[in-house]
Design a protein with these regions (language model features):
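Class I SAM-dependent methyltransferase SAM/SAH-binding core
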Residues: 54, 59-116
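A short glycine-rich, Lys/Arg-flanked "PGG" loop and its adjoining helix->strand segment in the class I
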Residues: 140-146
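N-terminal, positively charged/glycine-rich alpha-helical extensions of SAM-dependent methyltransferases
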Residues: 1-31
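Conserved alpha-helix/loop element of class I SAM-dependent methyltransferases that forms part
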Residues: 24-59
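A short SAM/SAH-binding and catalytic strip from SAM-dependent methyltransferases
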Residues: 125-140
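A short acidic, Gly/Pro-enriched loop at the edge of an enzyme's catalytic core
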Residues: 114-126
């Protein structure tokens, strides 16, 4: 088993034990986002300024290692066309739970971000990658893919 498989299993167990980054947003948070009241985190302590994103409606967004039902549902509520890629099965399940509850089908891809990404070049307008770089040995190949 390689280190990314071990990491995925570790994250799965954290999520099953109530890890804060594996707790999906509430219905109320989703509804607020639909009405323009929203915030997402890239790091644990500060909400990303809205102006970093620009207009979200119709924007194609990849949530890279962004499962958990926290950011991608917000972007979806804002009208973005979202795909989430994560190696944690439990994190992807949380995305699916939010989608089912809110009436949409999330595009979830289980893949290792240290490998070539399963998308054509320039498939996305924006890549959202919350803190996950600390779990991989070499960042350069990931950045080349992005």
């Amino acid at each position: 088993m390689n280190y990314t498989d071990i990491n995925a299993k570790t994250v799965d167990s954290w999520v099953q034990n109530g890890w804060e980054w594996g707790r999906p947003i509430s219905h109320e948070t989703f509804e607020k986002a639909k009405n323009g009241e929203w915030g997402v985190y890239l790091t644990p302590t500060k909400i990303v300024p809205h102006e970093w994103f620009g207009e979200m409606r119709g924007k194609k967004i990849l949530g890279l290692a962004s499962g958990g039902g926290q950011q991608i549902p917000v972007f979806t509520a804002l009208g973005a066309d979202c795909t989430v890629l994560d190696y944690s099965t439990e994190q992807l399940k949380r995305e699916e739970e939010v989608g089912k509850r809110e009436g949409y089908t999330p595009k979830c891809v289980r893949a290792d971000m240290t490998k070539p990404l399963p998308f054509a070049d320039e498939s996305f307008d924006l890549i959202f990658n919350p803190v996950s770089n600390c779990y991989i040995e070499e960042l350069e190949p990931v950045w080349r893919e992005c």
